[in-house]
Design a protein with these regions (language model features):
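Alpha-helical transmembrane segments of multipass membrane proteins
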Residues: 37, 112, 154-158, 180-185, ...
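Transmembrane alpha-helix boundary and packing residues in multipass membrane permease domains
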Residues: 25, 29, 41, 78, ...
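Small-residue-rich hydrophobic transmembrane alpha-helices
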Residues: 52-112, 149-168, 262, 276-339, ...
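Residue-level signal for short hydrophobic patches within transmembrane helices
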Residues: 11, 15-34, 38, 61-68, ...
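Helix-terminus/linker motif at the lipid-water interface of multi-pass membrane proteins
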Residues: 30, 34-53, 122-129, 185-192, ...
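Short runs within selected transmembrane alpha-helices of multi-pass transporters and secretion channels
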Residues: 73, 141-160, 168-176, 197-210, ...
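Transmembrane helical elements of multi-pass membrane transporters/channels
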Residues: 20-39, 141, 152, 175, ...
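Short alpha-helical transmembrane segments in multi-pass integral membrane proteins
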Residues: 1-22, 80-145, 191-245, 301-368, ...
Length: 447
């Protein structure tokens, strides 16, 4: 395999390798967040709070449907990274071919489910009648383009699996800028409304996916499968599906809990809906360095697991945890003082109730970010080792916790219950992952 300007993760100093690999992922994640955040900012400023609430009311469904497809792709990428670490080029090509086939089938499945169930689901969740039609137009557009989303995440995942986290960043920057320009053009010039924000997102992601494919074809052609590797391999497909569906289901279970939580938020009115979407957008940016480190540790562990370097895996997880804890403390302190101004900037609103509620959400939840950091790092570490059940069990803890809050806490505490819901659930989730990780680490190091 020809190696060009890719970070070496299976030998050498761990900290520089993780940082070098994580930094482009961080920048990619920032621009990925700009997709939805630019939608929120532009919709809020030019279409008003009602339209902003319409977009916000779909966020949980968006995460459920699109997150499933992306989770499956990321899960199968772990198998690809493992084959790369083991220097098994033939199996690597077969894995890419099988992943593409599975991705096409799953994309069609998601589109079908969306066509049948989106509007009833919005109604079931208690989406206010004043915004339900706008919500449907936006989320239906996103779901119909899920194949484009999967294609980009697959291509970017392939590059990251072989240590090239920088290339996808360049394409994503172009796409993010294009998304903002299209949002502004469609909304302010063509007056297409909320739906145009979804259209702009899909067009931008499609361009990013095409650029990624062209790059792979020219620079890393060994990733491209040829015709003879498109063959039925029962063991390979089972391995890819089990790993992919485990991550996809994990994401979906988390998102189902978020959908249930969204149903409670929808009962609190459009101001709270808008406050929640603004706060969540800010939180998404705040934890991006943590998720970037976690993404890098998944690839790091997958490659080193394939190379059977278990002591290096232990050191990598320790370093990743320390890095994420330092960031968590810094960003929590920052959010405590800047939440009101950030909320006003993101939402485009001067509504004091909206700003106060969103700020309270950020100031309280950020105190729990060190716990969230360990949760994300350990879950990704276990996924990198190919452990499917433990992260899935962790997701069930989150699901049942959110159901408990929606049924018995939020009806009595209002938005404060929403604020405390996830942070308090992170605690048992993290404890479970710590226990399992230490047990598996001991087994690997004593074999």
């Amino acid at each position: 395999m020809k190696r060009i300007q890719r970070v070496v993760l299976i030998d050498g100093p761990i900290l520089p390798a993780l940082l070098s690999f994580a930094f482009p992922i961080l920048l990619s994640n920032i621009f990925q967040q700009l997709y939805n955040t630019s939608d929120v900012m532009i919709v809020g400023r030019f279409l008003g709070q009602k339209s902003l609430a319409a977009v916000g009311a779909t966020s949980a469904i968006f995460d459920l449907i699109v997150g499933f497809a992306v989770g499956v792709g990321n899960g199968m990428g772990i198998i690809i990274a493992r084959n790369y670490g083991a220097k098994n080029e033939d199996q690597l090509r077969k894995s890419v071919a099988a992943t593409a086939i599975i991705g096409c089938i799953l994309s069609l499945f998601v589109i079908f489910i969306g066509a049948v169930g989106l509007f009833p689901l919005l109604q079931f969740l208690g989406t206010p009648s004043a915004i339900v039609s706008q919500s449907y137009l936006y989320i239906a557009t996103i779901v119909n383009g899920v194949a484009v989303t999967f294609a980009y995440n697959l291509c970017a995942g392939l590059l990251r699996a072989v240590g090239d986290s920088l290339a996808a960043l360049y394409f994503l920057i172009i796409a993010a800028i294009l998304n903002i320009l299209l949002d502004l053009y469609f909304i302010t010039q063509l007056h297409l409304g909320v739906q145009s924000a979804g259209i702009a997102t899909i067009i931008a992601q499609g361009i990013s996916a095409l650029l990624c494919i062209f790059y792979i074809r020219k620079k890393v052609p060994f990733l491209l499968p040829h015709r003879k590797v498109f063959v039925w391999d029962k063991e390979l497909y089972q391995d890819l599906l089990s790993q992919g569906l485990a991550m996809g289901l994990m994401t979906s279970i988390v998102s189902i809990g978020t959908v249930i939580l969204q149903s409670a938020i929808n009962q609190l009115g459009t101001t709270i809906i808008s406050a929640q979407v603004a706060a969540r957008r800010i939180m998404s940016f705040a934890v991006l360095p943590i998720t970037a480190i976690a993404s890098s540790i998944t690839t790091f562990i997958s490659q080193n697991f394939g190379a059977e370097q278990f002591q290096r895996i232990k050191k990598g997880v320790t370093i990743a945890n320390l890095l994420s804890w330092v960031w968590s403390v810094l960003v929590a302190a920052l959010l405590f003082f800047t939440s009101p101004s950030l909320t006003s900037f993101i939402s485009g609103s001067t509504n004091p109730d909206l700003i106060a509620n969103a700020s309270l959400y950020l100031q309280i939840s950020s105190c729990f970010y060190p716990i969230l950091a360990s949760l994300i790092i350990l879950r990704n570490a276990l996924q990198g080792m190919g452990k499917k059940l433990t992260p899935l069990t962790s997701s069930f803890i989150e699901l049942f916790g959110k159901i408990f809050f929606v049924l018995w806490i939020i009806p009595h505490t209002g938005y404060m219950g929403v604020i405390l819901c996830e942070p308090l659930i992170w605690i048992p989730m993290t404890l479970q992952l710590i226990i399992i990780y230490r047990k598996i680490r001991y087994q690997l190091l004593t074999e």
